[in-house]
Structure formats: C-alpha cells, structure tokens
C-alpha cells in the first residue's frame, strides 16, 4: 500500500559521510537511492522541474523530489 501525500511537506536531504540522510518531522533517516528520474514540464501556469528519488531506509520506503525551480526538497509518497 502507498500513501500519496496531498501536501508535499518540505524535508531536509544531506549527504553525510558517504550516506544520504533524509530529515522529516524531526527524524533523521539514512537512506539508499533505489531509482531516480527527472520530470520537466511547462504547464499553463507554472513550470515543473523536479528530480525524483525512490529511497529506502531502515523504517520506510519513500518517494522524494528536489524542486529545481524552488530549490527545495519534498516528500511526495510513503510506501508501506
């Protein structure tokens, strides 16, 4: 089962000592990247330019993205 989050909360992503670390809701989670892809589209209103990453950690599997327009990281989906 997967939970698509209606609002995509901003998260922190760091590269720490050879490990990718995601911080969300006060929790630091070391993760590995399973897959990545880029989406670039121009909608009638605002352009979308995102780098998506499917990541797995000790406690969850998630879909995160880097919004290249805003310069921020977000959590889009959690997998159970």
Positions of PLM-derived features:
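Non-catalytic peripheral regions of nucleotide-handling enzymes
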Residues: 1-80
């Amino acid at each position: 089962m997967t939970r698509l989050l209606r609002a995509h909360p901003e998260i922190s992503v760091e590269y720490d000592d050879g490990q990718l670390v995601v911080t969300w809701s006060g929790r630091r989670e070391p993760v590995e990247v399973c897959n990545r892809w880029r989406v670039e589209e121009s909608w009638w209103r605002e352009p979308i330019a995102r780098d998506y990453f499917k990541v797995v950690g000790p406690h969850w599997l998630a879909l995160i993205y880097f919004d290249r327009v805003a310069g921020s990281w977000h959590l889009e989906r959690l997998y159970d």
